């Protein structure tokens, strides 16, 4: 089941996007200097070490002490946090 979620997300990688508020939230939470947070998140998701799993309607991607939350229906990046 884990591999299925990962395969589905990776096959839809071009659909991943976020909102203006999402950009601000992700930049603040991860302390990023880049304006292209979607590219940053996609690169993390594409990393072979990324742990991808689904809970409810969301997909979660964990790598490098970062947790990215993506809506599994719209592929919208909702938020990203540092894992403490």
Predicted regions and their residues:
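Ribonuclease/tRNase effector modules and their secretory precursors
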Residues: 1-84
């Amino acid at each position: 089941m884990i591999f299925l979620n990962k395969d589905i997300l990776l096959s839809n990688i071009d659909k991943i996007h976020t909102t203006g508020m999402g950009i601000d939230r992700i930049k603040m939470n991860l302390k990023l200097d880049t304006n292209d947070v979607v590219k940053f998140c996609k690169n993390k998701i594409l990393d072979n070490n990324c742990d991808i799993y689904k809970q409810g309607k969301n997909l979660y991607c964990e790598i490098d002490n970062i947790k990215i939350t993506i809506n599994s229906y719209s592929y919208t990046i909702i938020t990203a946090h540092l894992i403490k």
